[in-house]
Amino acid sequence: GVTYLRNIVPRLAADSRLELHLFLLEDQIETFQPVDRRVRVHRFPARQNMLGTIAWEQAAIPCRARKIGADVIFSPANFGCLLSGRNVILLRNAFAVVRGDPRAGRWFYWSMLGVATFLSILRARKILAVSDYALRALTFGLARFLGRRALVVHHGVDPRFSPDAGVIREKFILVVADLYVQKNLLNLIRAVA
């Protein structure tokens, strides 16, 4: 979600119709620097463990959002604040990533993420997905019942990464990514081999 937020926050800040607030833990502040001057940053003490972070996300964020009069709480992390009905969530991480992972801790993590995502879908005001696949795969068969609450918002490609029309293409593909299963690099290699 960090890369996504670093790219979307300046765009949202440029929209004069929005009053943008960013809730960050102290240990996240440096990651998001520089923050657009039109964004109000709310700093919270860093949490010592994942349970503390989850408690902060689920309790402190909706309380603070209510206090500042926020109309919407946006979460780019598949799930939102379950205690709030003001959520807009972004579905982007496929649960299929855990299939090839033998670690019990990862299975538990992804299972809990699945439960949180399901509950968030039931509570969210709006559900955004990065692709048709993400919408189908991450809504547990509910996509067809969500109607206008669900919307696919394709990320797109920055024009800097599109060749000029007059450039002759060479026969190679440059892929810049980490090796997470959801990147589907194995199938890309098979497709071009």
Q: What is each PLM-predicted segment?
A:
Residues 38-63, 101-106:
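A short, charged, and often flexible helix/loop element on the N-terminal side
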Residues 5-8, 12, 173, 188-191:
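A structural motif in glycosyltransferase catalytic domains
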Residues 133, 156:
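Carbohydrate-associated surface elements
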Residues 72-74, 81-104:
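Active-site proximal beta-strand in glycosyltransferases
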Residues 11-48, 134:
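N-terminal strand-loop element at the rim of the active site
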Residues 107-127:
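Membrane-proximal helix-turn-helix segments that form the acceptor-binding/catalytic region
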Residues 1-6, 183:
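A short, glycine/small-residue-rich beta-strand->loop->alpha-helix junction that serves as a flexible
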Residues 167-183, 189-192:
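Conserved donor-binding/catalytic core segment of Leloir-type glycosyltransferases
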